[in-house]
UniProtKB/Swiss-Prot annotation:
Signal peptide: none annotated. GO terms for cellular component: axon; calyx of Held; cuticular plate; cytoplasm; cytosol; dendrite; GABA-ergic synapse; glutamatergic synapse. This is Calbindin. GO terms for molecular function: calcium ion binding; calcium ion binding involved in regulation of postsynaptic cytosolic calcium ion concentration; calcium ion binding involved in regulation of presynaptic cytosolic calcium ion concentration; vitamin D binding; zinc ion binding. This protein has four functional calcium-binding sites; potential sites II and VI have lost affinity for calcium. Buffers cytosolic calcium. May stimulate a membrane Ca(2+)-ATPase and a 3',5'-cyclic nucleotide phosphodiesterase. It comes from Rattus norvegicus. Ca(2+) 3 binds at D155, N157, D159, K161, E166. Residues 11-46, 53-88, 98-133, 142-177, 186-221 form the EF-hand domain.
Length: 261
């Protein structure tokens, strides 16, 4: 099925989902190693079989990743390579998803109750707003289809809602700083202890200076994952979740807490 979709001159949103599912064999949300090489090989075979030239985007993609063992792409990168239907592709090209800081601000707008999740109706409004900002409108049926596909693409634990880290897969891999923090998340007890330690004045939130101290210590302890030279970027992106410069426990937990275990 993936081969026939790769032969198409225009790939629908549903076909794109099937292609992604086919190649993301381990369900990690990214294509890397053998998965990525399989995609490149099947793409080349499918286009040749259909008598179609590689598009400029495909050529660039093959040149960039064809000979690399360490390549890694997300859904966003694949959406830019394949000839995906215009309105669906716009969801991956909007300005709000060009940088992690803008993404965090957008998340704050929709996660109004600080629950750490965006549910189906909120996601639908989020996608609708993105399309409207690109001067595109879709009917309710198509919007529902896009919402359903986004949940299928990003909802890795199948709970019908998206966590921040799941939603962040809308960002290009190079922009997704949250990936850096995946390996250093703390259990709930450790996180609460750390929050109370760095909330030095005990006012229930962490300000920019307190966050700076926390990040410096994290960088020192996790040199393989975090680069101390990037502290200002980490801080700017995390503070985009704050409420007027106040970073509450639930907000910081989205970045640093792995849950209650």
């Amino acid at each position: 099925m993936a081969e026939s979709h790769l032969q198409s001159s225009l790939i629908t949103a549903s076909q794109f989902f099937e292609i992604w599912l086919h190649f993301d064999a381990d369900g990690s949300g990214y294509l890397e190693g053998k998965e990525l090489q399989n995609l490149i090989q099947e793409l080349l075979q499918a286009r040749k079989k259909a008598g179609l030239e590689l598009s400029p985007e495909m050529k660039t993609f093959v040149d960039q990743y064809g000979q690399r063992d360490d390549g890694k792409i997300g859904i966003v990168e694949l959406a830019h390579v394949l000839p995906t239907e215009e309105n669906f592709l716009l969801l991956f090209r909007c300005q709000q998803l060009k940088s992690c800081e803008e993404f965090m601000k957008t998340w704050r707008k929709y996660d109004t109750d600080h629950s750490g999740f965006i549910e189906t109706e909120e996601l639908k409004n989020f996608l609708k707003d993105l399309l409207e900002k690109a001067n595109k409108t879709v009917d309710d049926t198509k919007l529902a289809e896009y919402t359903d596909l986004m949940l299928k693409l990003f909802d890795s634990n199948n709970d019908g809602k998206l966590e921040l880290t799941e939603m962040a897969r809308l960002l290009p891999v190079q922009e997704n700083f949250l990936l850096k923090f995946q390996g250093i998340k703390m259990c709930g007890k450790e996180f609460n202890k750390a929050f109370e330690l760095y909330d030095q004045d005990g006012n229930g939130y962490i300000d920019e200076n307190e966050l700076d101290a926390l990040l410096k210590d994290l960088c020192e302890k996790n040199k393989q994952e975090l680069d101390i030279n990037n502290i200002s970027t980490y801080k700017k992106n995390i503070m985009a979740l704050s409420d007027g410069g106040k970073l509450y426990r639930t907000d910081l937990a989205l970045i640093l807490s792995a849950g209650d275990n």
